[in-house]
Amino acid sequence: MKYRRGKKTNHKVFGEAMAILAGDGLQALAYEVMLSCIAKSDNMGYEILKKIKAANEIVMAAGTEAMVSGQVMDINSCSDKDSLTMLEKMHRMKTGALITAAVVAGATLAGADERQVVAFRKYGENIGLVFQMVDDKLDVSGDSRTLGKDIHADERNEKTTYTALLSPEELDDLIRKHTQDAKEAIEGVCVCPQGLMKLADDLMLRCG
């Protein structure tokens, strides 16, 4: 990948070693921000427990049981014709885990109860899959100037994608299904669902 958001990627500008260090530094900074917030809390009761749970959600998503394992699967999928089940598992652990962590952490800090957290988790998992499906679709049908990144990169790298395993019609149906599942998950449990509903719709409509 040479471009992201219309600019050259970190490793193309500064080299792979500096890019890896930048990633390590940013991840450590995220932990620093979260733990500093916890350490400065005067209230050692419910409020600090919410912060710990939110931080744990993010750390777990970035760790060996989620993003790291998903990335290993992605690397090993090169030149393989993986099943749709394996592809979905990989993206649940990568993109899906990070998006879900952001949603659940936010809900936890806002005081969501257990039932609401389950609903937000389901929303995040489905949105994560939709995000990747749309991304795969745009990689073969989008414009690099509009997207701000290289296209056909997955094909060149012989990666297994949703577009490689499904017809355009099947992929569109799956995008609609997971979008609807995400929206239904938070119906009746989210006080102000409009923003999250719009996010789901906008993501689906992004691919036309």
Where are these regions (language model features)?
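Mg2+-dependent prenyl diphosphate-binding active-site environment of isoprenoid biosynthetic enzymes
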Residues: 1-204
